[in-house]
A protein has these predicted regions:
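Non-catalytic macromolecular-recognition regions in eukaryotic signaling proteins
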Residues: 183-186
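Short, contiguous pre-domain boundary segments
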Residues: 9-25, 56
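Glycine-rich "HGGG/HGxG" loop immediately N-terminal to the catalytic nucleophile
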Residues: 364
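Short, charged juxtamembrane terminal tails flanking transmembrane helices
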Residues: 517-519
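Hydrophobic cores of alpha-helical transmembrane segments in multi-pass integral membrane proteins
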Residues: 2, 36-141, 148-174, 188-264, ...
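N-terminal acidic, proline/glycine-rich, low-complexity intrinsically disordered segments
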Residues: 1-10
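Cytosolic juxtamembrane amphipathic/interface segments immediately preceding
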Residues: 19-35, 178
């Protein structure tokens, strides 16, 4: 077979299997549901470590504590930044998409399942090497040459793995759609995955090129200064700056749309505007060109400032479309809805902060604290949106609804953690203009540390909510208001996902079927 192991037309319905674990089902699997669970589990665990690391760096910044040496603090800072993106947010969203996208498009599995499995294990091994290399003074600017080379090589492994996983998902969405499902009819999460994955395919290879330049010059020497310790981080830091940082949360926009429409029990109003808004957000998040190391004047260019300002518009468009959809609807007070609402709030704060950052008279570009605060808000957006998706699709993920009490507790934790981790640092960023804020720096940093700790707690509680899921096995349409094809298969999905599917005639095929039966 060229793309899948089993053709959709020969897949048959079966009773949902029990979730069992064995070496074969873990290490040898190409099943997209199992791979999705592994991506999600690893990302949540690494997310806890990433936020703890962020909190420790914040403690170091308070007063004259000097808890760590300057080199150790810098290593922790850079590992925290790269880790929260490449080890947490992107893998978490990839995991959810690996589980959901094949179901949404009516495919029997993810495209290139063996490549998808290879991508996960390559990513996991590379993540382990990255962490080990940083702990033995091999981080950016580290003094141990061999360990530093190992860190750079592990970064290349991470990038390669994420690109392969992305290609598998994009191929699934483009080539394995069920009959009648044109691209303008794909569910919002699949559309956002297409947009986000396309941006990752355009930008992550640029990051890989940066790392290759650093690696070659550092290992073999040469006429350039790419490999010098002081220059390494500067060449890749664009990854966690704006507008590029927005690109890593694009799939969240689709997840929020699906949560609001399904749990609201209504069709998405102005669906075309939603698809356009997600696409526009993706285009405006392209940041591979904004590399101050090679182009110091980039912050003075109208293109960079304009993209940072304009990206607010598609976010407002999406918020307006979601509000119009929910007008008159009464979604249940479930954790999935709460997490989606928190993600919307954090996203609005992040893009407004990004717009303020580029306004020259405010003098925020010289503030590391302001940039750190915006970064925290964007990462928290990705995690809150991911939590909304996890709770929404928990019947497909675990075969049970998540523990609602713990899930709601995690929503409160991510709301408090995200705002506390980001807003105090944004306020501290104005210290260049208001001298009084400098005197409050210790207090503001302390609040940000508490926010980072709350984020770690939120992820821990999320794991608990998913693992303690209980109750009877939900119906195929677990919420009773499903609109898209993932709610037409068992919870959890059976091997092959589907039997014979009817031709899709709109973007909400299950809602069409329900309305036809009622008529």
């Amino acid at each position: 077979m060229a793309i899948t192991d089993t053709r959709p037309e020969v897949a048959t319905e079966a009773e949902a299997p029990a979730l069992t674990t064995s070496p074969n089902t873990v290490f040898g699997t190409g099943d997209h549901t199992t791979l999705g669970r592994m991506w999600i589990g690893a990302a949540l665990l690494l997310g806890i470590a990433g936020w703890v690391l962020t909190a420790l760096v914040g403690v170091h910044e308070i007063g004259d504590a000097d808890v760590f040496t300057a080199d150790a603090a810098f290593t922790m800072f850079t590992l925290g930044r790269v880790g929260l993106v490449l080890l947490v947010v992107v893998p978490l969203l990839l995991g959810i998409a690996t589980l959901v996208v094949p179901l949404q498009v009516g495919a029997n599995t993810v495209a290139f399942p063996r490549a998808a499995a290879m991508a996960f294990w390559t990513w996991l091994i590379s993540a382990g090497v990255l962490v080990v290399a940083n702990t033995i003074d091999g981080g950016f600017g580290g003094s141990r040459i061999e360990a530093n080379d190992m860190m750079l090589a592990s970064l290349l492994g991470l990038i390669f793995a994420l690109l392969v996983a992305t290609i598998c998902l994009l191929t699934t969405a483009i080539t394995l759609r069920t009959p009648g499902m044109s691209l303008d009819r794909v569910p919002a999460t699949t559309w956002a995955t297409l947009v986000g994955g396309s941006m990752w395919l355009l930008t992550l290879p640029v990051l890989a090129a940066n790392v290759v330049l650093v690696y070659i010059d550092h290992r073999y020497g040469g006429p350039s200064e790419f490999g010098l310790a002081d220059n390494q981080w500067a060449q890749v830091s664009w990854l966690v700056g704006q507008p590029q940082i927005y690109a890593f949360v694009i799939p969240v926009l689709g997840m929020l749309t699906d949560v609001f429409t399904t749990l609201g029990g209504v069709r998405q109003a102005n669906r075309g505007f939603v698809l356009f808004g997600i696409g526009a957000f993706g285009v405006l998040s392209f940041g591979a060109y904004a590399q101050p190391f090679f182009y110091p004047e980039v912050a003075d260019q109208a293109l960079w400032a304009g993209m940072s300002l304009l990206i607010v518009l598609p976010v407002l468009l999406l918020v307006g479309a979601w509000a119009a959809t929910l007008k008159g609807a009464r979604p249940p007070a479930k954790a999935a809805v709460g997490a989606a609402g928190v993600a919307v709030l954090l996203l609005l704060l992040a893009v407004v902060a990004g717009a303020l950052y580029v306004i020259t008279p405010l003098e925020l570009r010289q503030s590391g604290a302001f940039a750190a605060g915006q970064f925290a808000l964007v990462v928290a957006t990705g995690l809150a949106g991911g939590m909304a998706g996890l709770y929404y699709w928990s019947p497909k993920l675990r075969g049970r609804f998540a523990n609602e009490g713990l899930a709601k507790l995690s929503v409160l934790a991510v709301l408090g953690g995200g705002t506390l981790a980001g807003l105090p640092l944004l306020v501290l960023g104005f210290a260049n203009r208001f001298d009084g804020l400098a005197d409050a720096s210790d207090a503001l940093n302390g609040i940000a540390v508490a926010g980072a700790a709350l984020m770690a707690l939120a992820l821990l509680v999320t794991i608990g909510a998913l693992l303690t899921a209980s109750g009877d096995t939900p119906a195929d349409d677990a919420w009773g208001t499903g609109q898209t094809l993932e709610w037409a298969t068992a919870s959890p999905p059976v091997p092959g996902n589907f039997g014979e599917l009817a031709v899709v005639r709109s973007s909400e095929p299950l809602l069409d079927a329900t309305e036809t039966q009622e008529a």
